């Protein structure tokens, strides 16, 4: 379930997301909240669930402030993630509450983490213990990776342990809901190279968790991850550009060599190319994980850690009781000098013991623990991680105290004795923890860790004890407060007796067990409150990288939107152009058809008009010809009549002869008229044939002209469309180049900002280290005069003792010499011996003065030499880290330039390919247009030839028919000969 995009953090409109949260008051359900750790989002608390009667861990996450939206989205992601995953080796999700601007994420309570164990025990784990923890962790990772999820923050601080020796994977605030991912997130020392370079080189997969697991194995084996002596920011650069880390060489006299399976397991987990690493399933099947081991390995490890925590807390309690008792006794005696000496002696022993452990190791261990807690999101709420400074101070302080008391006997003898009942009570196995100085001032309750029962006894659960057990515990607490496993805070010592008993019963009922001492928790809080530390720097750096990634995503979305808008615009332009051209084609073709129809109609009308005119002319000529023939007929008839009359023929014969003459004349007249009519008809037909041929030729020319115009229109439209496509290609090219330039400018700006942040962080780290070293040297310089005075006093004391011894010896020697010399020489001898004695004492004084000067000079030179060596080592270390940073920045800058060059080349190739394809398409369409023009012309020529052939055939058939029929009227049945031909 992806986080919803909300207008205001804390306001939920999606019912599916609202179902994840409860608006009830969590303070009414959970009681006895006590802080047990700090995370990057807030604090983690132990609490008691009154409804379900069980102990839980509550992670309070505030989502107010400048980054409220980002915090709220992260909360939604983590809550949604935990609500969807269920696995025996993943911390159980209980509930989630919203109270004002704080989210209460309730999960199962675990007693500590794997990091707590190595910090408390102050040594690495054995292989069998590492394998047991990794086996259950890999089981959880297999489940996550099968869901295409990436944890992205695997480390010992996020591998929790329950009181039943079950490993629980926690802290999903950095988890990714998709695989692959592309976000810079995680703890620096455990981040895979591809995660560090996520924004520069692309995405990463679930193999990033395998790298973190390999680093975690080294952490469990060596107490701290590789490169931990470096600045956290410098570690990022080192991981990104150097070879993978390996196990450090070990002293075989103290522990056995690492097995080949373990070395190979880490080697396969820490392959720099992600594809060469094992998957979670392959890791789980590795011989190192699958080899046999005792079933109670983790339980025994937890028990040893609990015992150590108990000893450390008891030591803190003893130290506080002794300091309080000594202050009271020295105040009564009023011996200010002795009190100062005793206090100096006590703290001096402690300081010496801690100094033997090594200041650098202690401070680095403290930073490791605090860094673990700060980088985690408070996972499971459970013990986020451990600060080892308290553990180291406690252990060394304990051993140092014993040694110190034997080495400073004179000081110890001046101390008043500590009552035996106090020593006996504080050494009882059931004694609980006592808060350190900070915890007393803050009135924080510290609860002891109850020893884990033996295998024969049932494993304690988080269920409350019975009433009988509670009553017996109350009685014990009332009878002997120092012999209980629970100790009330200082402020509770003044509570009413009944209230104290109720509080003790409540605390006993909750069974608060942890693998961390109270001093560790207090120091973790102090580390968290420091300003400008590496945690804040890393947080700012992560936010910067994530902000850059978010800005890039938004830019890519905007570019995609611009490209889509341009595509829609170009498609719309093409569609509009196509529609316009289709309409234009239809209009042109309609106009051409109309013109053809008009021309055909004009041809028909012209033919009809010509026929009508010609017929009228023929009729007129026929009338004239008939009249002429009639005149000729009359003339011939009169001539014949005159001729016959001249013959004086009988009337009947005359009449018969006249009839024959008239008949002959009529036949001649009719024959001539018929011939003339045939002539006129032939002339008309010839005229019609000429007209039709001429009009058909004109019509064909018109059709060819119109067809050429149609092809020209199509060609013009094609050229216009090609111009539009070229313009759109240029628009697309300009937009892509603009986007690429903006992207490159943004990446360069991001890189410069990132480099500035990295350089500023390195400078701050350098300044902080130099300031700390200067403070340390200043402290040593301020401490040196007191140390020199003490040693000078010791030398002078030795001098006085030697002088006293020599004086006694001189007196004895003088007495002996006086007794053996005469009395008159005694005075002279005494004077000479006294003079010799004075010279010896003066020489001895000179020697002691020289010894003091030499001691002061040696100490000063030695201190200065130490300080110079420390300054030189620190300068070399910081210079090396700065060089690595510069090299890393040069590499990233070169990588970016190479990437920019590749992207520009790729874009130019894409643009060139598109341009070539467009030009090829234009050429092909033009060739198709030319081919279409040629084919159309051929088709028109063929059609016109066929039409002319049909017309001639029609003329032939019509002419033969007319001649055969003879009596058909002119023009009848021939008016549609052109249409028939077409």
Curated annotation (Swiss-Prot):
GO molecular function: ATP binding; metal ion binding; protein serine kinase activity; protein serine/threonine kinase activity
The keyword Heme is assigned to this record: no
Enzyme class per UniProt: transferase
Protein name per the record: Serine/threonine-protein kinase SULU
Tissue-specificity statement: Expressed in the pharynx, including the pharyngeal muscle of the metacorpus, the isthmus, and the terminal bulb; in the intestine, including the pharyngeointestinal valve between the pharynx and the intestine, a structure near the anus likely to be the anal sphincter and the excretory cell and in several ring neurons.
Comp. bias (Low complexity): 353-373, 459-472, 957-967
E.C. number(s) listed in UniProt: 2.7.11.1
Subcellular location per the Swiss-Prot or TrEMBL entry: Cytoplasm, Cytoskeleton; Cytoplasm, Cell cortex
Disruption phenotype: RNAi-mediated knockdown leads to embryonic lethality. Increased and prolonged cortical contractility leading to a more persistent pseudocleavage in surviving embryos. Decrease in rho-1 anterior cortex localization and increase in posterior cortex localization, leading to a loss of asymmetric rho-1 cortex localization during early embryonic cell division. Increased cortical nmy-2 network between the foci, suggesting that the enhanced contractions are due to increased actomyosin contractility.
Source organism of this protein record: Caenorhabditis elegans
A UniProt-annotated Pfam family: Pkinase
Active-site positions on this chain: 153 (proton acceptor)
Catalysed reactions listed for this entry: L-seryl-[protein] + ATP = O-phospho-L-seryl-[protein] + ADP + H(+); L-threonyl-[protein] + ATP = O-phospho-L-threonyl-[protein] + ADP + H(+)
Stated family: Belongs to the protein kinase superfamily. Ser/Thr protein kinase family. STE20 subfamily.
Presence of keyword Cytoplasm: yes
Annotated stretches, region: Disordered: 331-484, 592-620, 751-789, 957-982
Gene Ontology terms: biological process: feeding behavior; MAPK cascade; neuron projection morphogenesis; regulation of MAPK cascade; regulation of meiosis I; regulation of nematode pharyngeal pumping
Top-level taxon in the UniProt lineage: Eukaryota
């Amino acid at each position: 379930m992806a986080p919803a995009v909300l207008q205001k953090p804390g306001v939920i409109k999606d019912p599916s997301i609202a179902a994840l949260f409860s608006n009830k008051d969590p303070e009414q359900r959970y009681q006895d909240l006590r802080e047990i750790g700090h995370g990057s989002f807030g604090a983690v608390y132990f609490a008691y669930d009154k409804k379900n009667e069980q102990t839980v861990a509550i992670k309070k996450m505030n989502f107010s402030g400048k980054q409220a939206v980002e915090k709220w989205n992260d909360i939604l992601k983590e809550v949604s993630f935990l609500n969807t995953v269920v696995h025996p080796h993943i911390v159980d999700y209980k509930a989630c509450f919203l109270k004002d601007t704080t989210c209460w994420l309730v999960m199962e309570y675990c007693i500590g983490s794997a990091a707590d164990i190595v910090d408390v025990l102050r040594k690495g784990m054995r292989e069998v213990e590492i394998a047991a923890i990794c086996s259950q962790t890999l089981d959880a990772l297999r489940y996550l990776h099968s869901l295409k999820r990436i944890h992205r923050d695997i480390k010992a601080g996020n591998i929790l342990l329950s009181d039943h020796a079950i490993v629980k994977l926690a802290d999903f605030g950095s988890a990714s809901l998709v695989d692959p991912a592309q976000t810079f997130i995680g703890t620096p020392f455990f981040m895979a190279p591809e995660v560090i370079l996520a924004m520069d080189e692309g995405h990463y997969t679930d193999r990033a968790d395998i790298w973190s697991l390999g680093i975690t194995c080294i952490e469990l084996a060596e107490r701290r991850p590789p490169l931990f002596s470096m600045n956290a920011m410098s570690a990022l650069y080192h991981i990104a550009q150097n070879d993978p880390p390996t196990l450090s060489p070990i002293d075989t006299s103290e522990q056995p060599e690492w097995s080949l399976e373990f070395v190979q397991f880490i080697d396969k987990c820490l392959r720099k190319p992600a594809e060469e690493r094992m998957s979670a399933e392959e890791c789980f099947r590795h011989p190192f994980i699958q080899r046999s081991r005792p079933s109670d390995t983790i339980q025994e490890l937890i028990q040893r850690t609990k015992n150590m925590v108990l000893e450390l807390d008891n030591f803190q309690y003893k130290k506080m009781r002794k300091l309080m008792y000594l202050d009271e006794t020295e105040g009564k005696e009023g011996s200010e000098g002795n009190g100062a000496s005793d206090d100096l002696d006590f703290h001096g022993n402690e300081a010496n013991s801690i100094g033997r452990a090594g200041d650098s190791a202690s401070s680095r261990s403290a930073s490791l623990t605090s860094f673990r807690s700060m980088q985690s999101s408070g996972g499971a709420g459970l013990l986020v991680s451990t600060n080892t400074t308290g553990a180291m101070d406690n252990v060394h302080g304990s051993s140092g105290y014993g040694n110190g008391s034997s080495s400073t006997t004179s000081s110890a003898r001046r101390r008043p004795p500590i009552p035996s009942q106090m020593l006996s009570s504080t050494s009882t196995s059931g004694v609980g923890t006592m808060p350190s100085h900070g915890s007393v001032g803050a009135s924080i309750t510290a609860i002891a860790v109850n020893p884990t029962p033996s295998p024969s006894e049932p494993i304690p659960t988080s269920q409350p004890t019975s009433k009988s057990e509670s009553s017996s515990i109350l009685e014990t607490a009332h009878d002997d407060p120092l012999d209980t496993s629970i100790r009330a805070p200082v402020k509770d010592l003044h509570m009413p007796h009944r209230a104290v008993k109720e509080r003790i019963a409540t605390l006993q009922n909750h069974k608060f067990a942890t693998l961390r001492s109270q001093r560790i928790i207090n120091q973790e809080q102090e580390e968290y409150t420091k300003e400008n530390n590496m945690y804040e720097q890393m947080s700012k750096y992560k936010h910067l990288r994530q902000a850059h990634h978010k800005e890039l995503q938004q830019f890519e979305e905007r570019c995609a939107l611009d490209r889509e808008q341009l595509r829609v615009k170009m498609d719309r332009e093409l569609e509009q152009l196509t529609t316009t051209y289709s309409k234009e084609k239809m209009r042109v073709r309609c106009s051409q058809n109309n013109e053809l129809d008009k021309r055909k109609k004009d041809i028909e009308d012209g033919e009809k008009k010509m026929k009508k005119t010609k017929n009228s002319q023929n009729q007129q000529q026929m009338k004239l010809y008939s009249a002429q023939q009639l005149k000729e007929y009359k003339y011939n008839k009169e001539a014949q009549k005159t001729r016959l009359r001249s013959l004086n023929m009988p009337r009947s014969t005359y009449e018969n002869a006249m009839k024959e003459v008239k008949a002959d004349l009529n036949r001649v007249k009719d024959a001539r008229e018929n011939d003339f009519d045939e002539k006129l008809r032939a002339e008309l037909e010839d005229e019609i044939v000429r007209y039709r041929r001429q009009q058909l030729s004109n019509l064909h020319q018109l059709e060819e002209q119109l067809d050429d115009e149609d092809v020209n229109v199509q060609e013009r439209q094609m050229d216009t469309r090609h111009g539009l496509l070229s313009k759109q290609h240029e628009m697309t090219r300009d937009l892509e180049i603009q986007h690429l330039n903006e992207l490159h400018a943004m990446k360069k700006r991001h890189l410069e900002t990132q480099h500035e942040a990295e350089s500023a962080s390195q400078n701050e780290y350098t300044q902080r280290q130099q300031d700390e070293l200067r403070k340390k040297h200043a402290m040593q310089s301020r401490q040196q005069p007191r140390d020199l005075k003490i040693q000078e006093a010791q030398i002078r004391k030795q001098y006085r003792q030697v002088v006293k011894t020599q004086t006694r010896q001189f007196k004895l020697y003088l007495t002996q010499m006086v007794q053996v010399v005469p009395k008159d020489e005694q005075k002279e001898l005494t004077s000479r011996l006294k003079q010799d004695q004075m010279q010896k004492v003066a020489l001895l004084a000179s020697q002691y003065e020289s010894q003091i000067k030499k001691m002061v000079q040696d100490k000063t030179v030695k201190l200065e030499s130490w300080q110079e060596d420390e300054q030189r080592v620190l300068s070399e270390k910081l210079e090396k880290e700065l060089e690595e940073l510069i090299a890393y920045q040069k590499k990233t800058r070169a990588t970016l330039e190479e990437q920019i060059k590749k992207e520009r080349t790729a874009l130019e190739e894409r643009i060139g390919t598109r341009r070539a394809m467009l030009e090829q398409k234009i050429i092909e369409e033009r060739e198709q247009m030319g081919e279409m023009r040629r084919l159309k012309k051929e088709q028109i020529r063929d059609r016109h030839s066929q039409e002319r052939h049909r017309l001639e055939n029609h003329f032939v058939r019509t002419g033969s028919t007319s001649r055969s029929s003879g009596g058909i009227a002119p023009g009848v049945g021939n008016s549609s000969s052109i249409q028939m031909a077409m």
